[in-house]
UniProtKB/Swiss-Prot annotation:
Names of the cofactor(s): pyridoxal 5'-phosphate
Other remarks in the entry: Some pathogenic strains of H.influenzae are active in tryptophan catabolism and contains tna genes which appear to have been inserted as a mobile unit.
InterPro entries linked: ArAA_b-elim_lyase/Thr_aldolase, Beta-eliminating_lyase, PyrdxlP-dep_Trfase, PyrdxlP-dep_Trfase_major, PyrdxlP-dep_Trfase_small, TNase, Tryptophanase_CS
Organism this protein belongs to: Haemophilus influenzae
The name this protein goes by in its record: Tryptophanase
Disulfide-bond pairs as recorded: none
Gene3D superfamilies, sorted: Aspartate Aminotransferase, domain 1, Type I PLP-dependent aspartate aminotransferase-like (Major domain)
Amino acid sequence: MENFKHLPEPFRIRVIEPVKRTTREYREQAILKSGMNPFLLDSEDIFIDLLTDSGTGAVTQDMQAAMLRGDEAYSGSRSYYALAKAVKDIFGYEYTIPTHQGRGAEQIYIPVLIAKREREKGLDRSKMVVFSNYFFDTTQGHSQINGATVRNVYIKEAFDTTAKHPFKGNFDLEKLEKGIQEAGAHNVPYIVCTITCNSAGGQPVSIANLKGMYEIARKYDIPVIMDSARFAENAYFVQQREEAYKDWTIEQITYESYRYADGLAMSAKKDAMVPMGGILAFKDKSMEEVYHECRTLCVVQEGFPTYGGLEGGAMERLAVGLHDGMRQEWLAYRIAQIEYLVAGLEKIGVLCQQPGGHAAFVDAGKLLPHIPADQFPAQALSCELYKVAGIRAVEIGSFLLGRDPKTGKQLPCPAELLRLTVPRATYTQTHMDFIIEAFQKVKENAENIKGLTFTYEPKVLRHFTARLKEVE
């Protein structure tokens, strides 16, 4: 299939879900009813749903067939061992705990690692700091609930939508080490490496950067947890952009990447392609004590450690999905789809972050310069996009970042982005063209879009359930 300008989707569509079309008047009422928060819209009122790629895409025929092998035994399920083998083969990690999704893993490992640091190194909880290239929202939330101050240490190009860099997800290694020294290594219970880096625009982390980060972590005896939702997309970018790995397979790059962490926490609803599921895993004997403590906590919060909130069939499906999500031709198609969408948006003058792995990230701050950050320009843009075309997207900016839990002040956000998250094997090029046309209509009315203010603001992870209104 060489020498074609565009290749079609590398799959056949066998099952479809009808969607309804609505009127502008209907959508205006729906978004008002939802408190100007697209999270609170009913899915049946969405024409194209770009809220998330988490569990919203298609599954492969092999994944669906695998569910028939499910062993629903309460303990010792053979389906658990199928999943554990997949984790061992792909990542090289010895100890696996299934969870219902990624945040299930976070609520287990975070308090365990904090308690371990306190017990062994004398951690002072009032001075506790944790570091990441950029924390995902639930990882940040669980860290803060457990009393930690979160620090994101990213490179200067990360949020500059006018800058090009092959690995915008990279840690700023100098800032990382300086931050550890300032906090005191004993007060740093873990480092989280997010691949790809969602908040920066689905941007990858290079293996060279992973090595440097892990060297610093080893120097100060701090465990590293890989936030692994989009591990396969990260491996694809490494293959395409990091010279030393251009001839490596996705499988080889993935295995190599995970040498530079001590554990992984995964929402398997992204690159592993399942509707529900997560994984917590640890590398080797050095993390055996942590593994056993996490197993104990799993019983209380998720379920027995050999099912962790998942039925046997779901574990079988996940074991297959981990492999299916790493297919070379699949990843090439997926990244090309994002590149097509970004190119189309920029052609009509809508500035985006350079194409990442799972979404197009529109620079709402540039498109709506008249709306200040504390009136959430990306959230306002999301509401307008829904009114115009029935498209649901998600804000990645000040609204999501939230307030400092100690001072109550809005945290400064490096960019105000609107994420157009593309579910896997769900939408075609025609959908991408429709999205681009919708933005053309939004852009024509951009100066009339109003900022937003709260009518209800939760204290934690406010973006999920907050309600807002337009600023008069």
